[in-house]
Amino acid sequence: MDRNKRRLESSQLRESSSPNSQNKPNAMEEIKRRRLQLEQRLAQQAQVPWEKRSENGNNAGMETIQNRISELKEKTAKRFNANIPKSEGLFRDDSNGAKGGLKVGIHPVLLDGNIQNTILTPENRKRTASFSTKGVSLSQHQLLKPPAITEQNPFLDTAPTPRLEDSPFYDPRTKESRKTRGSRNLHLNESGKFIEEANQARRQARLEDLKKRIALHSHKAGIEDELDITSKSIGRDTIPNIEWWDLPFIKDYNDYGDENNWLIDGPQSIINSAIQHPIPVLPPYAKNQPSSHSVFLTKKEQKKIRRQTRAEARKEKQDRQLLGIEPPEPPKVKLSNLMHVLGDDAIKDPTKIEAEVRKQVEERRLRHERENEERKLTPEERKEKAFRKKDEDSAAGLRCLVFRIKYLAHRPHRLKIDLNAKQWGATGVCILNANFNLVIFEAGQKAIKKLKRLMLERIDWTDTSRNSIIAQGNKLVDTEGRELNYTENTCNLVWEGEIGRRAFRYWSFRSCPSENDAKSYLEEQGGAEHFWMLAKSWSENV
């Protein structure tokens, strides 16, 4: 604290000894007086003990600092108030308390009676910025600048705008109150809510429609319009005492007798827990469904699959031989690998080894041919296989073809039709008539496909390169001897479709000179006379 006191006195001495002082002799006397006071104080401190000296020094130092702070406040206030003119119109006191520029309280150190808490008036706020941020830095001439005077238009109507409430036409009920929208909570609809609402709306619509129809019928019948239609009209019927299916046998359920005598749950009951499943019957269209074909493979892919299959079979065989399940096979010796397989034995006696190798090759060839002969089908087996294929084709679904041929006097044409029909196992008839010829085929899907191609593509019906049995002079004539112009011969497909059963038991040719003979024969064969009528009404222009 002594050090602080010395610094304070030194600063006072410097101030007193500054060149700005007006009276230098007085300053020298002041210095001498202060030096004398300092020496006396030091002498007094030397006589005081150290503990008391520290306490007195602290108290004296605190008092000196407070005095110095108060002096600085007074000087600052005087200097600040000297630059600002005292004008009541520029500043005004704030009755609410001291506030800063940003509505922040002034530091307690600066709160003094000499510092005025001021706030800018609205007039000054227009021409200057906020005092808190910019007013402190304004110079004196800016603060003293008078407000700008705006010239008013003398022709401008300065009368105050009338209030809406003062109008005689104002209705206070039209005043809208400010409506605030309240917050809404998140609401999740339950599952099936709107479905139930839609069903309820449909039921209500049906009920309204029912009411309208009942009202319309009652009006037509002359019933009063006040007919009450309630929910009872569409309600459930009451449960009868006995079901309608039991009425022909009993009149009341009490006629059954004692329940203990019933043969329903006992061992003699014909009712059990077994379920009878009927035999499934495929529909007709299921038989003609095209079979699913495997994916088509290229030649390279086929070779790869064959190679992999053979490698797997060879690997399995080698595994069985290693496990001792099968005996190992002797080496397959050929003339090309003779030296590689036999080695030293082939070098010792090449002639003998070559003869043995040729013998093994011949044995392998004979064994291969014998196995092929064993796998080959006998003539009876081939015939049985052909019949089985035909039956399988027919079992998949029967189809029918009806052709109308203009001329059929050429024998090779009849021969091709007859042979192909028998080979494919088709049933039907070929009716020869002077007007036109009718051919009917009944067979499976595959056979029908081949016969259709035969009749429409393979046979040239205008070809007469070979003579016919009934030809005369290399000319084709009909049964009555009339010459035929085969260049006009045609073959048309009249009808094609599926049939449920065969109408003919076998394939045959039938000569019918008249139309009645053809119709009567077809009627005898299962009612196929409609084919004749269909072919007769056929027109090539259609």
Swiss-Prot record:
Feature: compositional bias, Basic and acidic residues: 309-320
Comp. bias regions, Low complexity: 10-22
Region (Disordered): 1-32, 151-191, 290-329, 367-388
Subcellular location: Nucleus; Cytoplasm, Cytoskeleton, Spindle; Cytoplasm, Cytoskeleton, Spindle pole
GO terms for biological process, alphabetical: mRNA cis splicing, via spliceosome; mRNA splicing, via spliceosome; mRNA transport
Main location: nucleus
UniProt keyword Iron, yes or no: no
Record keywords, A-Z: Cytoplasm, Cytoskeleton, mRNA processing, mRNA splicing, mRNA transport, Nucleus, Spliceosome, Transport
GO cellular component: cytoplasm; mitotic spindle; nucleus; spindle pole; spliceosomal complex; U4/U6 x U5 tri-snRNP complex
UniProt cross-references to InterPro entries, sorted A to Z: Pre-mRNA_splic_Prp3_dom, Prp3, Prp3_C
Domain of life: Eukaryota
Coiled coil residues, start to end: none
Alphabetical list of Pfam families matching this protein: PRP3, Prp3_C
Subunit composition and interactions: Component of the U4/U5/U6 tri-snRNP complex.
Function: Participates in pre-mRNA splicing and in nuclear mRNA export. May play a role in the assembly of the U4/U5/U6 tri-snRNP complex.
PANTHER family: U4/U6-ASSOCIATED RNA SPLICING FACTOR-RELATED, U4_U6 SMALL NUCLEAR RIBONUCLEOPROTEIN PRP3
Name this polypeptide is given: U4/U5/U6 small nuclear ribonucleoprotein prp3
